[in-house]
Amino acid sequence: MTEKKKLFVLCVALFCFMAVSAQQRMSVSSPDGKLRFSLKVTSESVSYDIDYRKQPLITNSLLGFSFDSGEFGRNLKAGKVQRKKIDETYKLIVGKTSSVRSRCNEMTVPMQEPSDSGRLINLVVRAFDDGIAFRYEFPEQKAWDSYVMYDERTQFNLQGNPMALLMYLPGYVNTHEGVYSHVRYDKVARKRLIEMPATFEFDNGVAVAITEAAIRDYAGMYLMKEKGGLTGKLSPKLGQEKIKVEIDNFPHRTPWRVISVADRVGGLLETNILTSLNEPCRIEDTSWIKPCRTTFTWWNGNVVPDSTFSP
């Protein structure tokens, strides 16, 4: 090999090494090892993949935000990853079972802008045997203690062409009622709001449902198919078009973004992942809560004194 060829090979190897070293990769798997969430942080973007039984379900899906203080999602550096195992049991007041065992592996990834005064957001990921969930945490920090959010850019780029069961909505202000469509993923209409949960069944029988949990002090999320796949769309504040969320002080947490996974569609009904992610019941004494019949004022008129509902 000539000196020029040696130099060329060395330069190519060095370039490849620099490209790989510029990427930060980390992952977390479910207790049974079947589900895996993989995160990739580069100078250009933050993205994730989800594999089930070593087969890709969701790939190259971008994460990020648009704030009044600027975009968050580029030129980030991942800090030291914190991991823990969660294994707890809790009682359900209502539901499919009286007692639930919740097991998952958790990974927390600090993501910060380069400067010492750069904004910091933690990505918290939980891998259950029956799903993946992730949320963002805004810890207390000197240079940033509030925000006005214009958008949360969370993508769900499904692989293949599964059957989709979903409901289109006319707008952010709606009754959450309508006719469901059962179509192939490539036939899902673009630029139309989609209610959550949205369900997808792959040809091998694996089923996925995309939804959210633990919504507090935050906008509700819908889905919309755009170029590259599904993107989360936050409902604007009342009377606003641009502003989605305003937070006056930290710490703060977003809702969980939940991808429930099962070997068959029926398995999605059997999961308790949403109650495991929601906050515990705040009612100390629940003995008075019993099965009963109820009625709703928006069906039968203003039967409640001083009600603001109209028949």
Per-region residue spans from a language model:
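Structural motif
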Residues: 257, 293-294
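Substrate-binding cleft of carbohydrate-active enzyme catalytic domains
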Residues: 294-311
